[in-house]
Amino acid sequence: MNGISNALNGLYDISGVEVGQHFYWQIAGFQVHAQVLITSWVVIAILLGSAVIAVRNPQTIPTAGQNFFEYVLEFIRDVSKTQIGEEYGPWVPFIGTMFLFIFVSNWSGALLPWKIIQLPHGELAAPTNDINTTVALALLTSVAYFYAGLSKKGLGYFSKYIQPTPILLPINILEDFTKPLSLSFRLFGNILADELVVVVLVSLVPSVVPIPVMFLGLFTSGIQALIFATLAAAYIGESMEGHH
């Protein structure tokens, strides 16, 4: 009987896992999603702090830390050049910012003890655990590839919507809406699912089982950041080249 009671209590704890509770600030009559802002500011502070440490005293013979950041920069350049082509240079900061923000955000969900900070409603989690963040990142990507196409081709950029035949106009327009949606939902779904799986396993077996899952989550979080940055660069390159 005690075993059944413990199992039922475990299921009850799992049923209490919340996905949709939010904590809001009221600013000038508007509701501001405070959880995302707080965690995003922490991630931005980590990135800015790391950047300051990396560039404050550069050495001719790089130190271990400088070597690491130079490797990251070279990796981002390679991704940008592969997807965009020879005109990749101006887009390295954008692609790099996307990759690093998503990467650190994803890892913060597993490595930072967000839940020790008590909120009136909901709880803190990785910024990319919220659909508002992933949609915002996807919309920024949309603005970037429209800007890339318009800056390269002018108004002639819009001729792609009637190629190879005007009949495809609705489909080509719909494609530009589905690109950011697919980016945002893929990232949101993977990060949310990873955190929920860890929470459920911790509720059932709190000591051993969640550890391998957390390591797997760190790996997949890095892959998701790379996929998002790679697809963003590919969309920008596609808009500049004008092919599908």
Curated annotation (Swiss-Prot):
GO terms for molecular function: proton-transporting ATP synthase activity, rotational mechanism. Its main location: plastid. It is a multi-pass membrane protein. PROSITE patterns: ATPASE_A (PS00449). Keywords: ATP synthesis, CF(0), Chloroplast, Hydrogen ion transport, Ion transport, Membrane, Plastid, Thylakoid, Transmembrane, Transmembrane helix, Transport. The chain crosses the membrane at residues 35-55, 92-112, 131-151, 196-216, 217-237. Coiled coil: none annotated. HAMAP family: ATP_synth_a_bact. PANTHER family: ATP SYNTHASE SUBUNIT A, CHLOROPLASTIC. Key component of the proton channel; it plays a direct role in the translocation of protons across the membrane. Belongs to the ATPase A chain family. F-type ATPases have 2 components, CF(1) - the catalytic core - and CF(0) - the membrane proton channel. CF(1) has five subunits: alpha(3), beta(3), gamma(1), delta(1), epsilon(1). CF(0) has four main subunits: a, b, b' and c. This is ATP synthase subunit a, chloroplastic. It comes from Gossypium hirsutum. The gene is atpI.
